[in-house]
Structure formats: C-alpha cells, structure tokens
Amino acid sequence: ADKSTDMATPVLRLDRKSYNLFSEDRKSDRVGGTTVVFDKHMCALYFSKELIPFFEISKIGSDEQLPCYHHVGVYAYRKNILKDYLRWPESNLEKLEGLEQLRFLFENKRVKCVEVNSKGRVFWELNNPQDVQLIEKVLF
C-alpha cells in the first residue's frame, strides 16, 4: 500500500451512453452522479456534480475513449485521516458541491483514484426519481 495515500476511491471511465445520461441530468437541472479529474499519479484534483473536464464530444472520434470519469462513491480511508476529518471544518467548495471528499482535497490530502472496469455493465446511482427506471432496467 502507498503510505502517502490518505484515502482511495474507485472511478469508472464514462462511455458514451453514461456520458449522455450525465448530460441529460444536467440539462434537466437534475443533480446526479459525481465526476472526478486526477493527476498523472491518479490522485484526485477535483470532484464535481458537473461533468468535468469540459470537452466537446463532437471533437472526439467514435473509437476514442472519453476523458471523463464517474466517481463510484465508495472509499477506503486510513484510520487517522478519519479522525482528522471530524476536526476539519467544511470548506466552501464542499458546501457548494455537497461533496464530502472535497474536504480532504481542501486539506491537501491525497485521494487516490483507482480505475475499475464495469465489464460492459451500466453503472448508475439512485439520485433522482428518474433514476429508478434506469436502474430497474439494468436489474431486471
């Protein structure tokens, strides 16, 4: 284990279908999943309820992977960092986005992103009433 990592979390690269679902949510003023950008060492730079990074999908070839990652929302923490978390005040960004992991970034802690493979399955979270139908379609 990397001793310099304070926390780890899985991420999924968005395929076009998932990207379109995210886009539809935002265009309809629904807040849904979280996306993340990270550095060359896979350490998170920022998490957002918006699609990040910005890019024009029309400029990405149909055979190219999208540069956008969905944060799965599961964490592995070091014990001491959880104790520290309780002492830190909410940052303005955490309050604005409603994302607790931003507190770690604000405190300059390393959040390692681990890319996982959905093996062709659709991954979607239950954030809005409209999500139920999509999730039921996947399950049944």
Where in this protein do the model-derived segments appear?
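Conserved core of the sugar-phosphate nucleotidyltransferase
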Residues: A1-W88
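Conserved alpha/beta core of the MobA/IspD/sugar-nucleotide pyrophosphorylase nucleotidyltransferase superfamily
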Residues: F47, I60-F140
